[in-house]
Amino acid sequence: MNRYVLALDLGASSGRAMLAAYDGEKIRLREVHRFSNDPVAKDGRLYWNVPQLMREIEQGMQAAYEIAPYESIAIDTWGVDYGLLKADGTLLELPRHYRDSRTSGILKKAEESITAADLYARTGTQVMEINTLFQLICDQESGRLDDCEVMLPMPDLFAYLLTGTVSTERSIASTTQMVSAKTGTWDEELLSLFHIPHRILPEIVESGTDKGTLSPAVQQRLGLPAIRVAAVCGHDTQCAAFAAPAKTERHIFLSCGTWSLFGTELEQPVLTEQAAALALSNEVGYGKKVTLLKNIIGLWLLQESRREYARQGENYSFAEIETMARQCHEPSCY
């Protein structure tokens, strides 16, 4: 007899709902809903359209339950972005997109308080201005954190909107550049350097634990029972790394998407000057395994090209764009 679970996989350009059936030996996957993830621009700023994404998530949940009564739900997303909740549990504003320009130049300013080398040694995370830490510095300087009750990374935000439960899973927390590579806890000393209040940071929970069940309001709205929502690796890269069909303990992987991640799994983080110089990042995966990886630009340029074609009324598939590129007689970059 099959048992069913639902995976909600949200990337920076698209999302999907995958129904998994387990018969005791094999897991079979079925895509039941796919949707685009289109940011919204307003007043020169770029935001994630969380209300629309929630509508797509709920549509996927309903479509999957019509096929099979799944027992639990899990969510993963891209890294570094987050939502700020007010005391009444509502969003302070739509979550900012990591490609929003507000963090431009923030690294130079941050180095007045801590060097990039010291920051890497503390967190093991590649120092990039899009990281959660630097986004929160901008929020703190603008006064936005004054009205914030809690900060939730994106997978935990969606789980909260389904359950009402506040926590963050370890893998997604490790992308924030605010977790100590040595202790695995929020680095309070680092946060104090930038006057980021520790009170807004949620409890870090392990992958494989429960987030809770669908809230009564969600159950009533969608016509679903009290389905369990599990905390899995919230960062999509760590889900991919864990699922990679490696035959040995020592292996490398390449996870392709908007970003492509090239890396390997280790028992301990690599915090050396050489690793920092090579722009390697230490993230935490399932079972507290460390993933040492390199961020690569990935398919973002292709995705944006397709989006621009669509704006012009040309709805090319990725396969069609590939064919067009192969037929190009001047394969130069400009």
Which residues fall in each region the model found?
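Active-site core segments that coordinate phosphate-bearing ligands/cofactors
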Residues: 6-7, 19, 104, 111-123, ...
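Short glycine/proline- and acidic residue-enriched helix-loop micro-motifs
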Residues: 43-46, 116-126, 200
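N-terminal glycine/serine-rich phosphate-binding loop of ATP-dependent small-molecule kinases
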Residues: 1-93, 121, 147, 219-229
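Short, acidic/turn-prone active-site loops that include or flank metal/cofactor-
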Residues: 34-35, 96-103, 174, 258-260
